Amino acid sequence: MRTLRMLRQERGWTLDELARRTGLTKSYLSKVERGNSTPSIAVAIGLAEALGVDVTQLFGDAQDSANLEVRRVGTAADPTVPDSGSSFVHLAGGVVGKQMLPFLIYPPADEVECLYRAHSGDELILVRSGEIEMRFPDRTERLAAGDSVYFRGGIPHYVKSISPEPAEVLLVIAAPEEQA
């Protein structure tokens, strides 16, 4: 995410300042800037909010004038694999200033990376294939293909695959009002 460094420097911020504004460590932010670490979707949303930009600008696929984007089967970019273990494909990355942040995610099956995340904006998850387990602080839900869940992104949550085959999930996050 070399774009992160550019956006930070455009604001005249040091890594210390960005760390203060995001609650992330300076060393982690440095790793992200150098491309040695990839943030989760929740962390990327927090970075975008702190910088006052559309989250697509952090992934480097935003275009200035796209108001419509069609993605054909088989043309999706390779999934991004953040430090959280989930991999994801950012859908509609060329549209700037959108009110929804759509992703295809491929949740991990391991327990090691079970990190609860919270972020601004409401969230809709629809399981396209496989089965997942959605964990919240006070409950756990098992979802199969065709099942969905809607919740406030501010509720800490975690998703993991529980089926023998990898799960594919459509994730749509309502963009924070500042970005909408």
What are these regions (language model features)?
Residues 111-114, 133, 140, 149, ...:
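Histidine-centered metal-chelating micro-motifs
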Residues 86-87, 144-145, 153-179:
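Ligand-binding loop in jelly-roll beta-barrel domains
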Residues 106-107, 117-134:
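Short, conserved beta-strand element in jelly-roll/cupin
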Residues 77-116, 171-177:
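A short glycine-rich, His/Asp/Glu-containing loop-to-beta-strand
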Residues 25-37:
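Recognition helix of helix-turn-helix/homeodomain-like DNA-binding domains
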Residues 43-99:
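A short, N-terminal "cap"/entry segment at the start of jelly-roll beta-barrel domains
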